[in-house]
């Protein structure tokens, strides 16, 4: 869309009676050949109304980045994420009900202060259940001024690295398995030139 159309869409979104799902529908109604794609959604904002709009708007990519961070409820609570593993999995199931072809990506942090091996196993089991198309994985690093930076942490960087390596190996395997399902098919793609460093 043109800058003028983009600005108009931004003005519409500032109105209190228009939420993000409504905005997607309004942008979808703009004439032209384009794809609607948004970068990230906090699980609290991933609603059935949003999934329905994404499914019904033919210009909207069936792609969502839904950061989970951890598959363990205690760790999620310590992170102040505002949802549980069960609630997150229910959102994923609902999104895929509306969009069976949904491409789903996520962020995961390993080694959050106090995360045990058993709690990390919950994260591994979650990614096996969800089967993300891609994951952005990180080893926790403290940020000054945050509550987590003051939490006791008995685990070493080396122990966290072992978990990280296991997570990356599982993520890569799942991603490859999912991508192989597209072999022999023809797909319309969106090339993001801002990600290409020449």
Task: Tell me what each language-model feature is.
Residues 1, 15, 80, 112, ...:
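Pocket-edge positions in alpha/beta enzyme catalytic cores
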Residues 90, 94, 122, 126-129, ...:
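A non-catalytic, amphipathic alpha-helix used as a structural packing/dimerization or gating element
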Residues 1-9, 13, 196-197:
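Single conserved hydrophobic/aromatic residue that forms the stacking wall/gate
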Residues 64-66, 135, 189-191:
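OB-fold and OB-like beta-barrel modules that bind single-stranded nucleic acids
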Residues 7-117:
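Conserved SAM/AdoMet-binding glycine-rich loop
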Residues 101-149, 153-154:
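N-terminal intrinsically disordered, low-complexity, charge/repeat-rich segments that act as generic
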């Amino acid at each position: 869309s043109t800058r003028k159309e983009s600005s108009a869409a931004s003005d519409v979104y500032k109105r209190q009676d228009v939420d993000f799902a409504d905005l997607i529908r309004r942008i979808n109604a703009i004439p032209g050949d384009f794809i609607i794609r948004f970068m990230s959604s906090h699980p609290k904002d991933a609603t059935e109304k949003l999934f329905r709009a994404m499914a019904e708007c033919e210009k909207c990519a069936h792609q969502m980045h839904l950061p989970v961070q951890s598959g363990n409820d205690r760790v999620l609570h310590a992170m102040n994420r505002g949802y549980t593993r069960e609630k997150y999995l229910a959102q994923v199931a609902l999104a895929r009900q509306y969009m069976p072809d949904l491409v789903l990506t996520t962020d995961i942090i390993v080694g959050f202060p106090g995360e045990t091996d058993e709690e990390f196993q919950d994260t591994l089991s979650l990614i096996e259940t969800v089967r993300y198309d891609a994951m952005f994985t990180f080893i926790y690093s403290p940020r000054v001024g945050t509550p987590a930076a003051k939490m006791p942490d008995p685990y070493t960087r080396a122990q966290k690295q072992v978990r990280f390596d296991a997570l990356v190996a599982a993520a890569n395997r799942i991603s490859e398995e999912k991508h192989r399902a597209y072999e022999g098919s023809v797909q319309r793609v969106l090339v993001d030139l801002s990600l290409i460093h020449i």
